[in-house]
């Protein structure tokens, strides 16, 4: 499918997300010999519409195509990567890009328009059109928040997981850094909120889907992560939601909250400051399975204690649970409705630089905004410091075709 960079704001995320990639262009079946002639690990093309005649093949990027320029008509992607067919030389993207999905078996074929001038191979679909990671900008806070900042520069950071299982560190200046080369799709929960290991650096906690183990990845203070350490031996798949919270127990150490699937109970796991968790304490007797998002957002109401933001699935309402010593105070309505249109919630501290904790969200397909709509709009809701939020600000539209934000 031809995808134009000029379409994004309203439709590009949706269009790309629905592309079947490499299964398009039905027509007369090409000669089987032509398909089987394409070696494993190669992308192949023919000048004919039925895959016969002289074959072009490559397993590396081609900035120019020589005599094959603007001649591809039928193609096979016999690789495990996405293949980007660019209308211009040198992988330029202003005109259009045809995207062909991985087909390691090499049995699928299709048609492309005879306008291809360069070919590139990438691990994820979005990299045919955009960088592997989205844009992220944050203002410099007046003081360190103690969380949401992996490199201690007082700019809120984001971790992004892509569909290839890589982990990217976004430092708040629009740039990105690869901090996890592979394997992160094996984690079905990733959370962070401050220092759990006692070295004054923010850490990352991950739950391993296959084992239910909880792992601590110590922050290096630069955005990268150290060697993981076992934090919970097993059983964590029994929890429907896990949130790194900050200090709820009142001992100055970061804690973890978890909702038990079978009971809907909310448990507090106090941090020890040494990378482990203490004996759990019940802080919510029931009903927490009714919440479809939990965010340790820092001090939202200005009382000096960390608070919890929760989304109620049945109503789309957003609730603030004020932190007390080892418990929560009475909840306060923070957002009346519509919050089910958000895919992800991020509590990163002060994003806008006004000294108040803010809330960041990433939208679902149902979102309709002023300048952005659909999947992958990134919004900032500035905190007022009294438990309320100001109107949203649409700050980016390229947070789509990824696999999680933390």
Regions found by a protein language model. Give the residues of each.
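Secretory targeting and sorting signals
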Residues: 1-33
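Trp/Gly-enriched beta-strand/coil motifs that build multi-repeat beta-propeller-like domains
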Residues: 36-406
